[in-house]
Amino acid sequence: MKIAFLLVFALMCNLVHAQQAQTILDASKFLPGPPEDTSVEYLNDLTQYDWGKTMRNTPTWQNASTDMYYQLSTYINAFSPIVGLQISKTNTPNIYLVLDYIMTYGQNAIQQTNSSFGYVRRPYVRFSDHTLVPNIENQYSNISSYPSSFAFMGWLTALTLIEICPDKQNDILARGYNFGTSSIIAGFNWNSDVVSGRLLACAYSTVLRSHPSFNNMMKSARNEYEQKTGISNTIMSSDPNSSSFPNDNLPKAQYLPEPPTLESVLFSYDLNQHILNSRKRATIEGKTARADVDDSADYMAEIFSTAFGRTISQTETPNIYNLISKVNQTSAPAYNDAKESFSRVCPYVLLNQKTSYEADEDYYMNHGSYPSGHSTEGWLAAMVLAEINSENAEDLYARAYQYGQSRVITGYNWQSDVDAGSLVASTVYAYLHTCEEFLKMMDLAKSEFNGSTGIKAQFDNNHQTKSPLYKLDGTRVEGTPSNTGIYIQGNKKIVIK
């Protein structure tokens, strides 16, 4: 039995790992890049580095040093107590397989991204300083710090696990977020590395879900968790006539740090970003920002159609349009809860200024700005569309990033509001994958995009499964296999004679 499991485990790893070369994103198209030494962003990095050193060895951040060991066991040890199960190859083989896969996938993705931005010195290298973990300093000294691999893997693991264990979602997200903060405290990353690392994780969570084999692995992991705990992790369909998906149990934004106070140096960064971006209002970018005040489903369909590669409309792509429309009406409780909790004042209100779009000023006068709802809606739409068409993911994320920045330009949001909004979007996206109705509509949208009106029959031992067939080297088989032999389908080994 053990030998059989190890064989299938190895075959599945080979299969999914073989897909990596096809789906590594060019993150330079949608990440802002490392800041220049003379920029406000870099001054903020310096401030955060100094803050991190004051947090070392404090009770709150006692895990900061252990979080710096970039290996599967680190994440298993961090999340097992939260999940309530000892994650291991023998106790939870399906969950373990998922984490092993995203670890290997993530290493490849972050290495490619690091190289695309060039070498950025880590804080301890720049200042000839020491970290919390001196024994691994040499290992990382020649590896670029941007974006943060620790923030990336922590957030990607959290997004994956909340789909498997949605009943633990808030604690999982808090722990995943803290991996990035730990890397600042330990001295291995700048704040800008961490912000971009988490954003990169948001992007790759959709790339992973565009693979049928990964979705099958996730289904097995979800079933395993439910069998082990007796806790249902599937949201059944709601009223099909409802304008939104079930959203009573969306992840709470309690994993987010409190927004910067007026006395903090972090607020100085937000203020400088506000001043710099307000100067763009008379430019083409400023014109786009004024149009981007619209957060309706129709506007989302319009602005993402070019990046998506197909017109999104009720007449041309009704299944995709209906999915985006329903997603657009779903996420508000996730960010409104945080807005009410933090009650942060919008820039134009605090500074007694005008925005570049005055028509909305009265409406947002008494609304909290943190996190940005527009940023959440834009990133969520982009993530859903990127799962349907992963080949255009980079362009979709570039437009989502611009849509968020438009809120800083118009004066309705601070930069930290916008950064937080993208994270909220990623948690809602993961949550939606526990919703039966969302998954059905996603399948219809994918079929529509691929030019199919029905579900294509694929081979398995009964020749009726929906899953594609792969050779052992990871090559996908189109149509009927021409040769006998062993194939992989879903998470099963198939023998065709």
What residue spans do the PLM features occupy?
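Hydrophobic alpha-helical bundle signature of multipass membrane enzymes
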Residues: 19-186, 207-213, 223, 227-410, ...
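Surface-exposed, short loops/turns at beta-strand junctions within beta-sandwich domains
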Residues: 480-483
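Catalytic phosphate/nucleotide-handling subdomain of diverse soluble enzymes
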Residues: 202, 426-428
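Bacterial Sec-dependent N-terminal signal peptides
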Residues: 1-19, 237
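Short acidic/histidine-rich active-site segments
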Residues: 188-192, 198, 411-416, 422
